Amino acid sequence: MTNTQKAILAGGCFWGMQELIRKQPGVVSTRVGYTGGDVPNATYRNHGTHAEAVEIIYDPAVTDYRQILEFFFQIHDPTTKDRQGNDRGPSYRSAIFYTDDEQKRIALDTIADVEASGLWPGKVVTEVSPAGDFWEAEPEHQDYLQRYPNGYTCHYIRPGWKLPRRATSGS
């Protein structure tokens, strides 16, 4: 398989995000890191305004960007600014880092569907920004919940959660 694509998502602590996303059909690999901020060569101890994020490599013959985003919106709360569960601060914000104009279009369309669906109680605060440098997190953060299955996470699959497409005029 040579045709893969990349998605970069932030939705709180990267341990739980990575653990759930890695299990999705079509996901080839994941790695956690820091992106969307101001510090070069970011680390856990010095990541400035970067978000904890997951870089996802996927096979577009098996899954697509929209499906990945729908799952992303199912496993984290996109209506809380700079917070997921007990974690607070800009590192834990909800963000989509797009790699091209098509990803940006799909991200904005998916957010509009989330807003229209009423599946979340508040307004979606997920940032949509161009992808920049992605600083890979230290080895102890990679695959964390694989090594510590009872480790901390605030992410979970919501049973029965299915994102409908909103009705749009003219389509």
UniProtKB/Swiss-Prot annotation:
Reactions the enzyme catalyzes: L-methionyl-[protein] + [thioredoxin]-disulfide + H2O = L-methionyl-(S)-S-oxide-[protein] + [thioredoxin]-dithiol; [thioredoxin]-disulfide + L-methionine + H2O = L-methionine (S)-S-oxide + [thioredoxin]-dithiol
Coiled-coil residue windows: none
Segments crossing the lipid bilayer: none
Alphabetical UniProt keywords: Oxidoreductase
Catalytic center residues: C13
One GO molecular-function entry: L-methionine:thioredoxin-disulfide S-oxidoreductase activity
Family matches, as Gene3D superfamilies: Peptide methionine sulphoxide reductase MsrA
Signal peptide segment: none
Family designation: Belongs to the MsrA Met sulfoxide reductase family.
Protein name: Peptide methionine sulfoxide reductase MsrA
Organism: Mycolicibacterium paratuberculosis (strain ATCC BAA-968 / K-10)
Lineage: Bacteria, Bacillati, Actinomycetota, Actinomycetes, Mycobacteriales
Gene name tied to this protein: msrA
